[in-house]
Design a protein with these regions (language model features):
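Short, Lys/Arg- and Gly-enriched loop/turn segments at beta-strand edges
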Residues: 94, 107-119
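Short acidic, Pro/Gly- and aromatic-enriched capping/linker segments at domain boundaries
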Residues: 1-14
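Short loop/turn motifs at secondary-structure junctions and domain boundaries
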Residues: 2-5, 47, 65-66, 83
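Short acidic-glycine-tyrosine-enriched beta hairpin
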Residues: 88-106
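Glycine- and acidic-residue-biased ligand/ion/polar-headgroup-sensing regions
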Residues: 70-88
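A short glycine-rich, His/Asp/Glu-containing loop-to-beta-strand
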Residues: 16-66, 72, 126-127, 132
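A short hydrophobic beta-strand segment most commonly corresponding to one strand
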Residues: 101, 114-139
C-alpha cells in the first residue's frame, strides 16, 4: 500500500447567482482506517446524512429536459454513458465509474426558460446509474464542497 493519500475526481453541479455550473473537483481528505478482519484502507467520510439509494436505467435516446436535482445527490454511472448540460452552456459526458454531485437547487430561469440542467443518454446503450440522494438540503454556496 502506498503512503500517499488518494484523490478521487468528481463533477459538481452547483449554483452561482441563480445559474447552474459544473466544476471538476477532487475528494482528497482520506485517512487510513481499519475495520475488524480487514487490512487498512483509505476513507473520506463525506458527511452524515440520511440518504436514499436508487438504481435507474435511462433508455437509449432518453433526455431529461431542464430540471433541478430534487435534492443534493451523488450520481455514479455503472454502465453506458450519460451527459449533464448546465445553464452556463457546459456539457459533460460521463461513463462508468465517473462521479457527479448534483446540487443545482435554487436556480433562476434564464431568458429561454432553462432552469437547472438537462441530462440524457449518450450512445447506443442504456445508462445504468446509481443515485445516493441526501435528505439534507444544499450545502454551502460554491463549488467543490467535498474537497
Amino acid at each position: 500500500m502506498t503512503d500517499a493519500s488518494p484523490v478521487v475526481a468528481y463533477w459538481h453541479v452547483w449554483v452561482d447567482r441563480g445559474v447552474s455550473r459544473q466544476a471538476r473537483c477532487r475528494i482528497g481528505r482520506f485517512v487510513l482506517k481499519t475495520i475488524p478482519g480487514a487490512s487498512p484502507q483509505w476513507w473520506d467520510d463525506l458527511g452524515t446524512s440520511r440518504a436514499g439509494v436508487s438504481m435507474i436505467v435511462l433508455p437509449v435516446g432518453w433526455v431529461g429536459e431542464w430540471h433541478e436535482n430534487p435534492k443534493p445527490q451523488w450520481i455514479v454511472p455503472l454502465s453506458g454513458r450519460w451527459f449533464v448540460e448546465t445553464m452556463d452552456g457546459e456539457r459533460v459526458e460521463m461513463g462508468p465509474g465517473e462521479i457527479s454531485f448534483g446540487e443545482d437547487q435554487g436556480c433562476v430561469p434564464d431568458a429561454h426558460g432553462h432552469k437547472g440542467h438537462r441530462s440524457g443518454t449518450v450512445g447506443e446503450e442504456p445508462a445504468v446509474l446509481m443515485l445516493v440522494q441526501l435528505e439534507d438540503g444544499a450545502g454551502p454556496a460554491g463549488p467543490c464542497r467535498f474537497a
